[in-house]
């Protein structure tokens, strides 16, 4: 549910033309609602494939992963997306875990992974955000989407320590609520719900 739980509501509420999603299926109610919304609204669904690029105005988007056709771990199907707006770069890793991070390090030069903003993988879990991966990315800003007092203990203190060692500014939804980052292509501004 945490992977796509709100996707159908987004499609129902906004004018969504295209949906990029991994080539994975689920028997969950959320996935079923998503497919129903895609069909009902006539959204054009695309399978995320490495090397696919998209442009939205001056925003350039590239799919980096999933690199494999199948994974044992559902989290590893997460689309890993690199985005560039002017001179500012973003890396969105979904719930991809350490095995995908390792594959990304092997597949791409560090210049492809280096990003100003990182959406930290898997809610800051210890199963993601390895030291090697974070060193390749070294984000100026790291965003962790995580529920307050969650039963999983996310985010991991080890991940927080790694980000601190890199000097990253960390924003967490459990502490700050909604987080909005804006950029003009040169600078990044952050506004949070609770701060």
Task: Please provide the spans of the model-predicted regions.
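Non-globular, low-confidence helical/coil segments that flank catalytic cores
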Residues: 1-195
